[in-house]
Amino acid sequence: MFRCLMQNHQRRALVLFSGGQDSTTCLAWALERYAHVETLGFDYGQRHRVELDARQVVLRELRANFPDWAQRLGDDHLLDLGILAQVGDTAMTSDREIEMQANGLPNTFVPGRNLLFLTLAAALGYRRQLDVLVGGMCETDFSGYPDCRDDTIKSQQVTLGLGLGTRVTIETPLMWLDKAQTWELADRLGGQALVDMVIEHSHTCYLGERGQRHDWGYGCGHCPACALRKNGWERWVAGAAHAD
């Protein structure tokens, strides 16, 4: 089910790190695999800006609770992408009800977001000599975003390599995992300590709700992001209980 987590001491990684469940799990995956890992976040006027605070808390907790990973965890970077709110007026960047659109996509879809994220990550990685990009894109439990599809990511990898004239690898460890399997991967990587950290400190809720605590973490409990996280948690817990 999961890829082998052998360390690769020859390559350096840059993780697209929002502070959410998926990117936190991807960060742990990269820290287990690579000798040097840096993180990159984006401030694009997102409605759930609390995730920017969550990023720092997760990084702090990782350093404090996982000393081996702390030795491999390098600099954190944050880029201002306020222009995305101007280009794509969506429920992710404005106070409006989350709903499906006529094109079959939810209005939380920010056009070109992941394409821009990966382009900027590759440019930063080029300067920092980080030739592996790690992202939490996923085709299994996702909202239909076209820039999360495996074909999109593979195409972007080729384009970035050609445009930069160097080898670029985009790793997507969650691409074929559902949310229950993402919880399972976190447990496999860091045990209960990492699972607890994801619950307490990562942020997923599109509405930025941090006042309501659930078994699976904080959030409104109703938005699409919360629903995926909640359902994945319940399926993982049920599966673990059945295995016992």
Swiss-Prot record:
SUPFAM superfamilies hit by this protein: Adenine nucleotide alpha hydrolases-like
Cofactor note: Binds 1 zinc ion per subunit.
Reactions mediated catalytically: 7-carboxy-7-deazaguanine + NH4(+) + ATP = 7-cyano-7-deazaguanine + ADP + phosphate + H2O + H(+)
Cofactor field: Zn(2+)
Pathway info: Purine metabolism; 7-cyano-7-deazaguanine biosynthesis
GO molecular function list: ATP binding; ligase activity, forming carbon-nitrogen bonds; zinc ion binding
Cysteines engaged in disulfide bonds, as pairs: none
General function of this protein: Catalyzes the ATP-dependent conversion of 7-carboxy-7-deazaguanine (CDG) to 7-cyano-7-deazaguanine (preQ(0)).
Protein name per Swiss-Prot or TrEMBL: 7-cyano-7-deazaguanine synthase
